Amino acid sequence: MIYNSIMRSKRGRDRTFTETARRQQIIACAIDVIAEVGYPQTTIRKIADRAGIAMSVVLYHFGTKDGLIEAVIASKYQAALETVPPAINRARTQTDKLAAYIRSSIDYFDTHRPQLTALAQLGTSYKPHSGKHFGDLGLTPELSEQLAQLDPATLLRAGQKTGEFCYFPVDSTAIALQAAVNAVVEKILRDPEFDVHRYSDDLVKMFSRMVRNA
């Protein structure tokens, strides 16, 4: 998994399957607790109780609460990388890849609502003791390189290069596209009944028309 490379054990060895599974369990429980009670009320004890383990087990795997929070944030990137790039790669044309980017990104948000709630809590309430900027948490150089796959500018440029897309300012269009996709997060957090599939369809139609080479 992506975040397995973020932190090695203090003994400098790779984790066993059992250790990896335990970390994933603790991360999932941390997400649930943060989403349910808010970050200010989240403690290692509550997370350990949710997982049915001792607090010492949580600290063994993550060292500190900050270490656990970094792993929670890294898991967000992992989930996105497991969802969006494969969907794009399965598509054949650049138009289909654009649609796949939009649909898979919104599907990722739709199927990870507890994570979104937890991350919203962390974004407003969590201050890392390390002094890191929130946007840098959970990132490694390797992971940052992999996250470049989530930048729609790449597929937009590819579409122009093949002649499938017309001319348009790629960077500005990519920013607008990302903003439109990411806007669904606040919407679904405020309105759980929001029709994300219709929203996906609308965005696909709008941006396909915008970039299509007539």
PLM ranges: what are they?
Residues F62, Q121-H129:
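Short helix-capping/turn signature of helix-turn-helix
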Residues Q78-L81, P85-P86, A118, H129-T162, ...:
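Amphipathic alpha-helical packing segments from all-alpha helical-bundle domains
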Residues R22-I31, I47, V72-K76, A80, ...:
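Generic hydrophobic, amphipathic alpha-helix propensity
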Residues Q25, V33-G67, A71:
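Helix-turn-helix
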Residues E36-P40, A91, H112, T162-G163:
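Short coil/turn segments at alpha/beta junctions that flank glycine-rich nucleotide-binding fingerprints
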Residues M1-K10, S104-T111, Q149-K161, C166, ...:
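C-terminal peripheral helix-coil segments that are non-catalytic and often amphipathic
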Residues M1-A21, D32:
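N-terminal intrinsically disordered/low-complexity leader segments
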Residues A71, E82-Q115, L177, S200:
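Hydrophobic alpha-helical connector segments
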